[in-house]
Amino acid sequence: MTRRAGLYDPASKALGVAMLDFDGDGRMDLFVANDTQPNRLYRNKGDGTFADAAVAAGVAFSEAGVARAGMGVDAADYDDSGRPSLVIGNFSNEMMALYHNEGTGLFIDEAPRSAIGRASLLTLTFGCFFFDYDLDGRLDIFAANGHVADDIDRVQSRVTYAQRPHLFHNLGRNTFEEATPQAGAALQTKLVGRGAAYADIDNDGDLDVLVTANNAPARLFRNDGGNRNNAIRIRTIGTRSNRDGIGARVEVSLRGAPRRWQIVKTGSSYGSQSELTPTFGLGAETKVEGMLVKWPSGQVDTIGPLEANQIVTVREGAGVAGATPLRSAPGARP
């Protein structure tokens, strides 16, 4: 089946996979992050087969034309363009990649000109993902770091085996800043990080982070204070589509803001699975004007308005099947 689908690639070393509709044709494509081999971007042709478009799209190599050591990857619309972009974890001395989807079939790596590139030049990133840690409505980036050689500092004095994670705060207008120093003492601990995933473990609306590490226990970082802004979380139940609604596109409309969307997805990051429930940060907004859920079956459910600070269950073809309030924290917006 893999060979017939055009995905058979025994020469590559795949470590991270993300699904995205990069060309806006309504079909889910596949991105594969490869270690020391060109990345692959498999365009879904709609007939059960795929064609590699990575070179033409500008995501196969670095800007210098070199194949990097791709590890983890995630896809999301971090700039409200309506198009999914890519974040990729790479080897030390390569920096992370932030491929912005230009909407023309081409991606441009924004990392070398941003705080992301400067901060990640010496780190080796495995797990990475987009998520809105402060619920301001803009997707931020988390990266779990750690080298593969425990004596790397002998040959590269500025590179260490255990490394701190990165938390990049999205300031809007394609600008990020590293927020790790302000995120609390827990994120200052150096780890040989590998997998990374997120979930709201305490039902308070903000997203917590789990990181696995070599030769050490997993670390669960609870997000305290991220819910000072409002949020809405959407749980999907498929009927004609798959049970969990994987592949559904959830779009929310807010007063005076661009429509925001997320995909109910599996995979992404590195060796990890985050929760399926999309979480939308609403900032100061207290309700969602409207919501669309576009299911893999083709069914479209129109819902709303909805009050903020709840987890809403949507059943395919039936609309809202239930809603549960989120547990608010001291300092949360009323």
Model-based region annotation:
Residues 2-10, 51-67, 108-124, 158-159, ...:
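Short loop/turn motifs that recur once per blade in beta-propeller domains
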Residues 13-15, 37, 69, 94, ...:
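Beta-rich catalytic cores
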Residues 14-24, 28, 43, 70-79, ...:
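Beta-propeller blade termini
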Residues 25, 29-34, 85-90, 141-144, ...:
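Hydrophobic beta-strand segments that make up the repeating blades of beta-propeller
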Residues 40-42, 97-99, 164-167, 219:
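A short loop-to-beta-strand structural motif that recurs across blades of beta-propeller domains
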Residues 45-48, 102-105, 171-173, 224-226:
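Short loop/turn segments that connect beta-strands within beta-propeller blades
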Residues 116-118, 157-334:
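Gly/Ser/Thr/Pro-enriched helix-cap/hinge segments flanking short amphipathic alpha-helices
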Residues 143-161:
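Short, conserved, GDST-rich strand-edge loop motifs in beta-rich repeat architectures
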